[in-house]
């Protein structure tokens, strides 16, 4: 008998909203649109934008500890870094394709930096990159 009583309670709970169909449907429709609207807000949220601003700021403080940077200048530098990385990646991809390789190694990156950056800037970039790779390799072991 107890299980039947338990079954009756949910069924009576189900009957109570069914008794006032018209108002319940209107409320549910309102709830659905409100839920959908709040669901849209939750889905939209804040999309995370990956930038190099924290790294640029750290380098700035290493070079000039008492100097600040505006948001616009940071945005310009971020665009610059993205552009250079894209150029290097594209060139490295072409080099790998020319050599019929499916993997971009440090050699392709180094060659693409030499091709993209002019003269002395390329030399400094290659030496800093080599130093960074050496440091990473020694710390990984």
From Swiss-Prot:
Can you state the subunit structure given in the record?
The nucleosome is a histone octamer containing two molecules each of H2A, H2B, H3 and H4 assembled in one H3-H4 heterotetramer and two H2A-H2B heterodimers. The octamer wraps approximately 147 bp of DNA.
Q: Show the SMART domains listed in the entry.
A: H2B
InterPro entries found in the cross-reference section: Histone-fold, Histone_H2A/H2B/H3, Histone_H2B, HISTONE_H2B_site
Q: Name one GO molecular function term.
A: structural constituent of chromatin
**First-listed, main subcellular location of the protein, grouped into a coarse class:** nucleus
Q: Which Gene3D superfamilies does this UniProt record tie to the protein? A: Histone, subunit A
Biased composition (Basic and acidic residues) is annotated at 1-10
Q: Does the keyword Glycoprotein apply?
A: no
Please give the family membership noted in the entry.
Belongs to the histone H2B family.
- Listed Low complexity bias regions: 11-22
Q: Which domain of life is it from?
A: Eukaryota
Q: Name one GO cellular component term.
A: nucleus
- The protein's name in its UniProt record: Histone H2B
For the region Disordered, give the residue spans.
Answer: 1-49
* Organism in which the protein naturally occurs: Aspergillus oryzae (strain ATCC 42149 / RIB 40) (Yellow koji mold)
Question: Residues of crosslink Glycyl lysine isopeptide (Lys-Gly) (interchain with G-Cter in SUMO)?
Answer: 8-9, 26-27
Locations listed in the record: Nucleus; Chromosome
Cross-referenced PANTHER family, in alphabetical order?
A: HISTONE H2B
Residues in cross-link Glycyl lysine isopeptide (Lys-Gly) (interchain with G-Cter in ubiquitin): 135
